[in-house]
């Protein structure tokens, strides 16, 4: 799963920023992008001068504190890490059903996503390679990414960090978000 690790994605992003002529920059990310941004700040501290993460707690903490509420709310974390081709086969059988179910689970109002945006998600999730890549991202999170995080225990980010979360979101209700991020950042 190494090619789908947050470290590999961070390296790709760093290469893009270097190619664009940016040796230092701010980065912000939400959800999976927040996890990549966190890894980018860890692996390239000379480049990332400010970090913002939205609606996430540190990955290892989320796995380490899993309970029934978390497992129910984030069931896809545990479904998508199952060995291939199990989740890929189930999703590809009816990608529209999978996406509609996820959108309903994640949001209170289906109108929050436009029909055009949903159609683009469906177009992408009708491609077996996209489904596999999505599963591999989660498999990496539950394996090699946790190894990378474990190697960083005790090493705190020393850059300005902005953490934002929704008042009614699962992570905001389950975790003391400021305390959670103080464990990994100054």
Q: How should each PLM-predicted stretch be described?
A:
Residues 2-28, 35-186:
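Flexible "cap/lid" subdomain of the alpha/beta-hydrolase fold that forms the substrate-access gate
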